Regions:
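A mature extracytoplasmic/lumenal domain signature
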Residues: 33, 104, 125-129, 158-160, ...
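Structural recognition of the beta-strand scaffold that forms the well-ordered cores
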Residues: 28, 100, 120-125, 155, ...
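Extracytoplasmic/cell-surface-exposed regions of Actinobacterial cell-envelope-associated
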Residues: 79, 83-92, 100, 113, ...
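Active-site-adjacent structural segments surrounding the nucleophilic cysteine of cysteine proteases
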Residues: 1-89, 93, 127-129, 134-138, ...
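A short acidic/basic microdomain associated with nuclease active sites
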Residues: 18-19, 99-102
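Loop/turn elements at helix/coil->beta-strand transitions in domains of secreted/extracellular proteins
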Residues: 94-98, 117-122, 163-165, 192
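Noncatalytic regulatory segments and standalone regulatory/sensor domains
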Residues: 136-148, 154-198
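...with weaker cross-activation on analogous glycine-rich loops/strands in unrelated enzymes
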Residues: 87-89, 93, 103-126, 130
Length: 198
């Protein structure tokens, strides 16, 4: 974090209002990140509405469902495929014009054009950019997915190419600039999971 950081004139910064996940959703970073983006598009969601009404849960599956309960500290999380479906469920119910798209596999630099078009991106990283630790796996459709201790999900809402920083709306830390190199390392290590709503 860089509290004294002053962005350059080349910086892009989207007005994504931050929502802190605690105390209601200690493991609900993904649903809070989705809520921030949906609210950016004019939906008026309370902090827990996505988690309570739209998130499908499962005791084992963290890929297409939320493993555990986001209201509980022992909950784990939900990966991009499941979060994309959660967004689609909400948007369909609202008859909203937007569509959710899973961009998993996209390099970080290729997400910047979305920001240029005023489209924030939900991105998976780690809590406070700590090194992810592989703690579980789940197989679905013949593909093995790994779950990591320190798993986290934030909204990428800006970047500063001159100073090599990215702006994130983090449900734990607030709105913060992060060093691009380290952020990219974690993003890549986590499988480059990203979701956009267009």
């Amino acid at each position: 974090e860089y509290p004294d950081f002053v962005p350059s004139s080349q910086a892009v910064s989207l007005p994504v209002e931050n929502i802190l996940q605690n105390p209601e959703l200690p493991t609900g970073c993904e649903s809070v990140a989705l809520t921030m983006v949906l609210n950016y598009y004019g939906h008026r969601l309370a902090k827990t509405e996505i988690a309570d009404r739209y998130l499908l849960k499962d005791p084992e599956n963290f890929v297409t469902r939320f493993k555990g309960d986001p209201h509980d500290i022992s909950g784990d999380g939900i990966y991009a495929p499941g979060l994309t479906e959660t967004a689609r469920r909400f948007l369909s119910e609202q008859n909203a014009p937007q569509k959710a798209t899973d961009l998993t596999g996209t390099p970080l630099s290729e997400l910047y054009p979305y920001l240029d078009r005023k489209i924030p991106v939900i991105v998976y990283d780690s809590v406070y950019l700590k090194t992810p630790v592989d703690v579980a796996e789940y197989v679905t459709d013949g593909e093995t997915w790994h779950f990591y201790h320190n798993e986290h999900c934030i909204v990428l809402c800006g970047y500063d190419p001159l100073n090599r920083r990215v702006l994130v709306s983090d449900a734990l830390s607030g709105l913060v600039w992060r060093e691009e190199r380290r952020f990219t390392e974690i993003y890549d290590a986590r499988g480059r999971m990203a979701v956009v709503i267009l």
